[in-house]
């Protein structure tokens, strides 16, 4: 009986290891799928990254790849290098492609045109997550209605996808839940400035300080400059 149980446990562990995304897929693995194109995603996108320049090359991403490692909106605001029949380009992830299969992207027309023929409408592609072609430090978006009692904070202008955000309270780091709309949420954050800690998709960690949050939850959304950036 002990031998049977040991064998069963071993099979379960092997199955978990083999089929766990975290165990089998690196963040910068090459993905294969298809691309379509759309003119949306520049405003009102699922990840609340407005404003987005109208000439920027952007994409919506399928749900399976978006939530890498089981983290909601893990690839929101990231950059992807996409290759199609005509060449390569780099796009900014701004929206969800809800009906897209794993590997699928819904590109802006200017991005699609660089890698495929518009008349085809749908093309085969390969893509991977790459370091963002940006400069400067983070920017934080404080969502409308935020206060010291409840707050939703978004990290922008990051070189690599942000997987985790924590804040320090009473000498302890408290995890903030990442939401589908690409903000980290928590409650009872305190009355002073907020010490925060961010972890990127590679496991690199940086710390920063955000000015104290509003006392009441009546404020509009606003942004504050950060002082750090993920390392190369």
Swiss-Prot record:
Domain Expansin-like EG45: from-to ranges: 58-127
Subcellular location: Secreted, Cell wall
Disulfide topology: none
UniProt xrefs under Pfam families: DPBB_1
CDD domains recorded: DPBB_EXLX1-like (cd22272)
Signal peptide: 1-25
Keywords on record: Cell wall, Secreted, Signal
Gene Ontology cellular component list: extracellular region
Record flagged with keyword Signal: yes
Function: May promote colonization of plant roots. May cause loosening and extension of plant cell walls by disrupting non-covalent bonding between cellulose microfibrils and matrix glucans. Has very low expansin activity (in vitro). No enzymatic activity has been found. Binds to peptidoglycan and to plant cell walls.
Protein name: Expansin-YoaJ
Source organism of this protein record: Bacillus subtilis (strain 168)
